[in-house]
Amino acid sequence: EFRFVRWHDVSTDVLPAGGSKAEGIRLMIEKLGIDKGDVYAFGDGLNDIEMLSFVGTGVAMGNAHEEVKRVADFVTKPVSEEGIWHGLKQLQLIP
């Protein structure tokens, strides 16, 4: 059985039933004993919504789909403007 997740007008992810980025993160934090509140994720596509909603802090890229921005905790600059670097600075995760 499969799950289909559209993340762009012309692109769809095909995943095993129950599979998602959020599920992968859940399994990893369980294995490592990390608190979900300490987990950060960056995303820009519709396939990132579940992940951004799941983690402690979800960051949408400035170029993200509007639905992605709505579920994120905050929005950083677009990918093309070093958005991840700026987001990490905003979160005070890097100097």
UniProtKB/Swiss-Prot annotation:
InterPro entries: HAD-like_sf, HAD_sf
TM regions (residue ranges): none
Residues annotated to bind Mg(2+): 44
Cofactor: Mg(2+)
One GO location term (cellular component): cytosol
Binding site for phosphate: 21, 47
Molecular function as annotated in GO: magnesium ion binding; phosphatase activity
Keywords tagged on the record: Magnesium, Metal-binding
Family classification: Belongs to the HAD-like hydrolase superfamily. Cof family.
Protein's name according to its UniProt entry: Uncharacterized protein in pdhA 5'region
